[in-house]
A protein has these predicted regions:
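Conserved double-stranded beta-helix
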Residues: 1-49, 54-55
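Intrinsic-disorder/low-complexity, polar/charged segments enriched in Ser/Thr/Lys/Arg/Asp/Glu/Gln
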Residues: 30-32, 90, 100, 122
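Glycine-rich loops and low-complexity Gly/Arg-rich segments
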Residues: 22-29, 38-40, 57-62, 72-76, ...
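Non-heme Fe(II)/2-oxoglutarate
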Residues: 58-66, 97-102, 106-155
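Double-stranded beta-helix
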Residues: 40-107
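Glycine-rich, charged/polar anion/phosphate-binding loops
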Residues: 17-20, 34-35, 87-89, 107-110
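A generic fold-level signal
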Residues: 7, 25-28, 42, 85-87, ...
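Short histidine-centered beta-strand/loop micro-motifs
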Residues: 13-18, 22-25, 92-94, 112-116, ...
């Protein structure tokens, strides 16, 4: 995914854990990768994390595929109780362009709006250690006959 926070109007990304959107068992087998194309600063909406939150969070709130609509498209919804994070525990993580941030599937993170005169571009994607890992059948994103998730390597 390519993220582009435009100057002055690039919005916030609300606090969340990636496990809400990508449920696997065991959950520690999902990892986000975030690569800034521009320096990510306090002013242009750098990432914020709650340190150590991956050790205490669980996935009780999920974005899931429920069933197909009459047109055959999947119906997506949130299930469960959303975690409420203490906002004063978030710590900003300004980072230089070209760096790499690894994001555990249970760590609480967010970003603030871009209030600067400069854009903030970033690439992000998620990887799953598929070895001995179950991909939940109600995840919003599912492989199909036409599109299989690519393997980065084989064990």
């Amino acid at each position: 995914m390519y993220i582009f926070k435009q100057p002055k109007i690039g919005g916030a990304v609300t606090d969340h854990i990636d496990g809400t959107f990508l449920q696997v068992d065991p959950i520690n087998h999902v990892m986000g990768v975030w690569i800034p194309v521009d320096d990510a600063t306090l002013e242009n909406g750098c990432l914020w994390f709650i340190p150590g939150s991956h050790k205490v969070n669980s996935v009780d709130y999920r974005f899931v595929r429920t069933h197909a609509t009459e047109s055959g498209k999947p119906l997506l919804t949130f299930r469960g109780e959303k975690l409420i994070f203490e906002q004063d525990k978030f710590v900003p993580v300004p980072i230089k362009r070209g760096s790499l941030v690894l994001i555990h599937g249970l760590v609480a993170h967010k970003s603030e709006p871009n209030t600067s005169e400069k854009s903030r571009h970033a690439y992000t994607f998620h990887i799953v250690d598929a070895h001995n890992t179950a991909w939940c059948k109600d995840n919003w994103l599912q492989p199909t006959e036409d599109y299989k998730f690519p393997n980065l390597y084989d064990n």
